[in-house]
């Protein structure tokens, strides 16, 4: 596999094959793509699955129609929604990578692009500011976290979502704050 920002030319492919002692058909290009979900299609176009199956003496019949449908809906959504992701560690989006990927998949399944609005709970300190913070969101996700820092903001967020009838999901401490707010 040759990672590259650009298409690997035939001459480069042949040179790599020569020095790696493999047939040039076994030099697979892993060029940059816009989405990680395109990578299996790029490899399938180069028959990587078939090469591996042949080498391992397996029967190979790729089933990529669902991936192609997924990619089409991913690239051409019919709708857009904005979800407020509220938590303590919003300056580190990778802390919530699994949640972000879940939104990608849920969005694709519903023909929608999910835009994220990051909100630090320490910024929510009173009812006056909260209206402007959530004025442009279609839903609120209160993220997990530990400790008391930002708890007041979380409880105010739960109250706002309930009173304004904004779709809401609290995970872990987020759900606990929703129960506290309601009780």
Model-derived features with residue positions:
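N-terminal beta1-alpha1 cap of cysteine-dependent amidohydrolase-like domains
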Residues: 1-182
């Amino acid at each position: 596999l040759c990672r590259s920002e650009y298409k690997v030319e035939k001459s480069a492919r042949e040179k790599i094959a020569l020095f790696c002692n493999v047939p040039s058909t076994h030099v697979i290009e892993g060029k940059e793509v816009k989405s990680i979900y395109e990578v299996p299609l790029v490899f399938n176009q180069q028959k990587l699955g078939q090469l591996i199956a042949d080498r391992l003496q397996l029967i190979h019949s790729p089933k990529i129609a669902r991936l192609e449908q997924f990619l089409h809906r991913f690239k051409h959504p019919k709708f857009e929604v904005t979800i407020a992701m509220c938590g303590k560690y919003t300056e580190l989006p990778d802390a919530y990578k699994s949640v972000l990927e879940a939104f990608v998949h849920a969005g694709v399944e519903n023909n929608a692009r999910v835009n994220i609005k990051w909100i630090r709970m320490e910024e929510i300190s009173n009812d006056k500011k909260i209206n402007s913070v959530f004025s442009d969101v279609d839903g609120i996700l209160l993220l997990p976290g530990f400790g008391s820092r930002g708890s007041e903001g979380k409880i105010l967020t739960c109250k706002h979502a309930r009173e304004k009838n904004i779709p809401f999901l609290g995970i872990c401490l987020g759900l606990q704050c929703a129960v506290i707010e309601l009780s």
